[in-house]
Amino acid sequence: MRVRWLRKALRDLDDEAAYIAADDWLAASLVVQRVIAAVGMLAEQPGLGRPGRVPGTRELIVRKTRYIVPYRVRVDSVEVLRVFHTSRRLPGRW
């Protein structure tokens, strides 16, 4: 199954990386690698995440980080909707 990142999700990941890199570029790189690796597993295991708070979505908790990746499973692809730090208040919709 193909994994497709929405623009908002890519922007979220880029913003988070920039924020972390201001203090520690190595930590930022590690977080990005972990998020990308975790999301990559969805191609083979789209049901990996828990049921999402927003109907019709699932949420992948990225191990060894404090990030949640909401996504939607389509017939032939997985859509990555956003990337959120767990300290943030999550929106009611994506």
PLM regions with names:
Residues 2-57, 74-77:
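Basic, Lys/Arg-enriched alpha-helical interface segments
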Residues 57-59, 68:
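Short, acidic/polar N-cap/turn motifs at the starts of alpha helices
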Residues 47, 66-67:
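A generic local structural motif
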Residues 62-64:
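Conserved strand-loop elements at the edges of beta-sheets that form or border functional pockets
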Residues 67-68, 72-94:
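Enriched for short, Lys/Arg-rich terminal
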Residues 48, 60, 90:
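Short clusters of hydrophobic/aromatic residues that line enzyme substrate/ligand-binding pockets
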